[in-house]
Amino acid sequence: MAVQQNKPTRSKRGMRRSHDALTAVTSLSVDKTSGETHLRHHITADGYYRGRKVITK
């Protein structure tokens, strides 16, 4: 098993973790038919996508 030679510094740990931060959702769309807000390229909670009903309950 691999064992580290020296303890990584706080700086190296921070540099490794610098890309792990969560980002806010910035790409929201409003459906033409229902006016509901949803993620882009996803259907709404009502089952609409690009103005069409794609899922019926």
From Swiss-Prot:
Please give the SUPFAM superfamilies that the UniProt record associates with this protein: Zn-binding ribosomal proteins
State the source organism's domain of life. Answer: Bacteria
Molecular function via GO? structural constituent of ribosome
Query: Can you cite a GO biological process for this protein?
Result: translation
Output the Pfam families linked to this UniProt entry.
Ribosomal_L32p
Q: Where is this region: Disordered?
A: 1-26
- State whether keyword Ribonucleoprotein applies: yes
Please provide the record's keywords in A-Z order: Ribonucleoprotein, Ribosomal protein
Indicate yes or no for the key word Secreted.
no
Q: Name one GO cellular component term.
A: large ribosomal subunit
Give the UniProt family note: Belongs to the bacterial ribosomal protein bL32 family.
**What's the protein here called?**
Large ribosomal subunit protein bL32
Q: Which organism is it from?
A: Cronobacter sakazakii (strain ATCC BAA-894) (Enterobacter sakazakii)
Phylogenetic lineage: Bacteria, Pseudomonadati, Pseudomonadota, Gammaproteobacteria, Enterobacterales
